Amino acid sequence: MKSYISLFFILCVIFNKNVIKCTGESQTGNTGGGQAGNTVGDQAGSTGGSPQGSTGASQPGSSEPSNPVSSGHSVSTVSVSQTSTSSEKQDTIQVKSALLKDYMGLKVTGPCNENFIMFLVPHIYIDVDTEDTNIELRTTLKETNNAISFESNSGSLEKKKYVKLPSNGTTGEQGSSTGTVRGDTEPISDSSSSSSSSSSSSSSSSSSSSSSSSSSSSSSSSSSSESLPANGPDSPTVKPPRNLQNICETGKNFKLVVYIKENTLIIKWKVYGETKDTTENNKVDVRKYLINEKETPFTSILIHAYKEHNGTNLIESKNYALGSDIPEKCDTLASNCFLSGNFNIEKCFQCALLVEKENKNDVCYKYLSEDIVSNFKEIKAETEDDDEDDYTEYKLTESIDNILVKMFKTNENNDKSELIKLEEVDDSLKLELMNYCSLLKDVDTTGTLDNYGMGNEMDIFNNLKRLLIYHSEENINTLKNKFRNAAVCLKNVDDWIVNKRGLVLPELNYDLEYFNEHLYNDKNSPEDKDNKGKGVVHVDTTLEKEDTLSYDNSDNMFCNKEYCNRLKDENNCISNLQVEDQGNCDTSWIFASKYHLETIRCMKGYEPTKISALYVANCYKGEHKDRCDEGSSPMEFLQIIEDYGFLPAESNYPYNYVKVGEQCPKVEDHWMNLWDNGKILHNKNEPNSLDGKGYTAYESERFHDNMDAFVKIIKTEVMNKGSVIAYIKAENVMGYEFSGKKVQNLCGDDTADHAVNIVGYGNYVNSEGEKKSYWIVRNSWGPYWGDEGYFKVDMYGPTHCHFNFIHSVVIFNVDLPMNNKTTKKESKIYDYYLKASPEFYHNLYFKNFNVGKKNLFSEKEDNENNKKLGNNYIIFGQDTAGSGQSGKESNTALESAGTSNEVSERVHVYHILKHIKDGKIRMGMRKYIDTQDVNKKHSCTRSYAFNPENYEKCVNLCNVNWKTCEEKTSPGLCLSKLDTNNECYFCYV
């Protein structure tokens, strides 16, 4: 009963009470857009109304429908009132969707200011921006990885050319504009009519939304874009012609029908007024796309919609199952993972099978990857105490825990802690600090404490306090990790980076002084122009430009023009290249160069294999004695490759900074050559670039008046090659305490002294409420620096800067053959559930962020709101700040920083998840406390308690032990082994 009341409370708080009628009964309903009986499914605006059954979710491990978060209590149906006022509509998601009865497809309707994204799992992605009437199709197939603009209909998938089959693309619509399906008649029925106007529009790309200074890809055929005045500034602006008959406007509604007929994907688009006017335009925009019959068929349709109103942010994700060929018990486990809000369905599904102790011959195991099945026994044998035999490591962990407790004090109200002052350091803390640094020296391999003097108790305390202040918003596990950076034990801590750079800028001349602006703009090739028209586009044709044909960039859920973070995909080759530490040696140029080549190998289909940095350091034709004290550049890296024609793996010749300067080793028979069949290409002579053999560099200063072009170059190279080398100025900017999770807004310099790698990019909203974009940068200072070795920096930097923080970017021009032999197949479970990235949901919020509607919540208000919500019965991911030891320690660090503003921006986001199968709807919910919470790869707040009263206990157990289990093959299984009372379920975390 408690969970029953909690669900009703949440639903009635989230949605307008006048729109949602809270009852305890299921209610039959139609889709609201077509005639009864012609569509099946639920309405997008509802919270669980089902035409044929009640909502419900399943308990972990159970194949019978039950509630996964309320320990067996049924989840009540919440039905939608059929009438609502215009003001009430603002409170709910107005995008409504329903399955078609006679076709494999979906009908979506709503007002013209509502946007949504649709996936035809596992292949097709459709992004619908109704405000600009911009519909874009992408595909996850390796051969067809870019975008098609619905409007352009030019037969172009950006860099890939497609064969067009003649057919009418725009038809007149007969009958009601509701698009009712009658018998065998197609949705939004067609009749012949005149062709739609043809415009010379290239395929549009939805790129990262950003502020006026941010990058924005040109979206051709956008209704909001305007051409320049023809006769001066006083002339009226003229909108470019559109290649669509139906253009969304305020006050109108849209209807989109997507369905499969034989081997053709058909999309129909219609705009109409709120009242059906018989004199209204009766044209329907229709596009048809051939799909490859040999590919895995579509198994489900997933639709995402977003709504923000009065500080409440709703994300609704609905998964419509199209078939039932997956065994029921397997589908139940997987759908539970989806409903929990877990992005990594495979990891969660794998954990569920392991926790349930199913043997590897169970039918559900065939939906996992081959590696998991083949290593079944090893995974099951993994224990939580694998490393407990390392006594020094154990004592170091214990010492860090003691210091964190002793460095904070509790005030008289016992509700707020702060860092102690220097004069408050007692003898026990002094002893612990010295013991801590002694233990750290024993395990440290970077040479920090061997080459610089160790500080006394006061030095160490001040260094740690400075670290805690700069990382005030980190959780306890992250802080413990940062305490393993040996720099905190130095007497003069700023000396730490003196020998951790090592870039010497090469002397090169510009091959082309003049910047060809058109090189970086989207433009149509002659083939594109020939393909303009209306009809059927071949989605599986393989003609493609040379620069992308040879790279496997099919992971566009994790890396595309809007955002790119392959680190969030645990199965990706690049995410398995662990951060390295160059040690006390000026070798950043080697680590940045070799990582760039490693990611190129990943994008060519090779296994994640590290290149030996020590081999490159020692195999050069010069003096060896000062090799660790003088830097160089990526040009020398390429020269060494060409001179020797060999690159061993890191495992063949491991890096140790003390060995830098030795003689070049003799290649042994068992060593692997990672440069086998590789070639360094000649100069490309790119405009506005510095060129060497196998090397192209772009200085940001040359793009001062066109930084968008500079950004676009980097994005393109990261998408294709996995990374670029970046030159930056680290001196007096980056130290041991540098925060990696916050986006740094930094100026640059006219010179550079350090080489790093740009590995991705994303979007954020700054403290002023402006939409901005950032680079994800990988450093070579070890995993205890920054955000596990990475940091974020604003793409454009402050407006007053003379130089961008990224001084230059470098791209290798090398030829490596594609390796198709070792390409691993995705787990079969992703044929039924979307392989999603946390970045996708964060980007969904970002694209719809309205600066004028942002709402601020204090931390106190957050805690009060969470108390009202009760335990985590229905809401997945409820905030548990302040509960348990771990939570307390985390909050003390937050409050001790003395932030300039006690009221921080906390945007409450509620994620409603629905799984619709066989007319039944099962529902889950998750609450995020802020936008960064949306972006997290894991969250202990998704812990599940079989008895709801133990929820906080389960979350605390997860937080305390996460570091122990994080690197295990199945962290959820590891946590379950630590739950000796069997009170919790951790597969959702």
UniProtKB/Swiss-Prot annotation:
**Bias kind Low complexity: ranges:** 52-87, 167-180, 191-225
- Post-translational modification summary for this protein: Just prior to merozoite egress from host erythrocytes, proteolytically cleaved into multiple fragments. Cleaved by SUB1 into p47 and p73, p73 is further cleaved by SUB1 into p56 and p18 and p56 is further processed into p50 by an unidentified protease. p47 remains covalently associated with p18 via disulfide bond. p47 can be processed into p25n and p25c by SUB1. p25c and p25n remain associated with p18. Proteolytic processing is essential for merozoite egress from host erythrocytes.
Looking up InterPro entries in the UniProt record yields: Papain-like_cys_pep_sf, Pept_asp_AS, Pept_his_AS, Peptidase_C1A, Peptidase_C1A_C
Give an example GO cellular component term for this record.
symbiont-containing vacuolar space
A molecular function GO annotation:
cysteine-type peptidase activity
Question: In which domain of life is the source organism classified?
Answer: Eukaryota
User: Which PANTHER family did the record assign?
Assistant: CYSTEINE PROTEASE FAMILY C1-RELATED
Q: What is this protein called?
A: Serine-repeat antigen protein 5
